[in-house]
Amino acid sequence: SVSGDPLARMDWLDDKDLKQKYLDSDSDTLLYMGCIPSYLVKDSAYSTIQVLDKLGCDFRIIEDEGCCGTYLYECGKTNTAKDYFEKNLEKFKALGIKKLIVPCNGCLKCFKYFYPALLGKTGIEVEHAVETVFNLLEHQQDLLKKVNQNITFQDPCRLARTENKIKEPRKILEYCGASV
């Protein structure tokens, strides 16, 4: 991993119930945290799994997730990146994964664009966690605690510019009763 000790990758998840529920379940959807949430913004990783759990999302997590390989690709090490991508894709296919949910914009870009660029079609759908939450909340807004606040939201570059996901984060905040 580019961010730390591979053995510490799951340190963000100390909730034994959530860990037991999602670790290596038989879902064909993988919540792929990525290096940044797993090592650097651990509350983001934990919040993601809590929200998806609360919304009844069907997914699994794995302990030996590894890095998506985006940095190898972006620094021009395409042969090494391709090997990395192939190993990850093999792992996903062996687990029967058909969909990846990722909270990391770097992983999103890598799985959605870099993997197909080097490997062709992967047969795995890739979705940012914001999209997943938005889709789940459209029909479950009653689960949210309403806040009566004005909020300023700054779009994450890759999510807004590459994916054009501008309305989804704002709608989620509006579902919570916020004015954006």
Regions found by a protein language model. Give the residues of each.
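Redox cofactor-anchoring modules in respiratory/redox and cofactor-processing assemblies
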Residues: 138-180
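Short, structured patches in soluble enzyme cores that scaffold and shape functional sites
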Residues: 33, 104, 128-130, 155
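Short, flexible loop segments at boundaries between secondary-structure elements
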Residues: 120-147
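Short, catalytically relevant binding-site loops at active-site mouths
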Residues: 107-109, 132-135, 158-161
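Conserved active-site and cofactor/substrate-binding residues in soluble primary-metabolism enzymes
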Residues: 43, 83, 128-131, 164, ...
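Iron-sulfur-cluster electron-transfer modules
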Residues: 1-119, 136
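Short, structured coil segments at secondary-structure junctions
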Residues: 55, 121-123, 176-177
